[in-house]
Amino acid sequence: NLTITKALLNVIADAKTKVYGDADPSLTYQVSGLKNGDTAGAVLNGGSLSRVAGENVGVYGINQGGLGLVSANYDLSYQGNNLTITKALLNVIADAKTKVYGDADPALTYQVSGLKNGDTAGAVLNG
């Protein structure tokens, strides 16, 4: 008797990075172990990877999500990776002020740009 066993299909998630407040990048992966001219599109179901929820700066795992096999000729080995959210650049620019010698100092003010996700200057700046 000849027994044909399943081949091991390796799926490795690509590491991803985004800046706080930006949209998630596409979660992609690499495939190895295909046999006999098979393609990833023919043996995988086309499902998407998912990631651990969260939008603050930090590291979030990339999971297998809905990605799976449609071919009975393979066993799937999935290796996750991480989505890293980095800090956004916040610009604070002091407004130009003038005063006449001897007068009281004017109120010092500034402009802020680069706020994201509905953040306000009062919520992210102190002092």
Model-predicted regions and their roles:
Residues 1-127:
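Short loop/turn motifs that initiate or flank beta-strands
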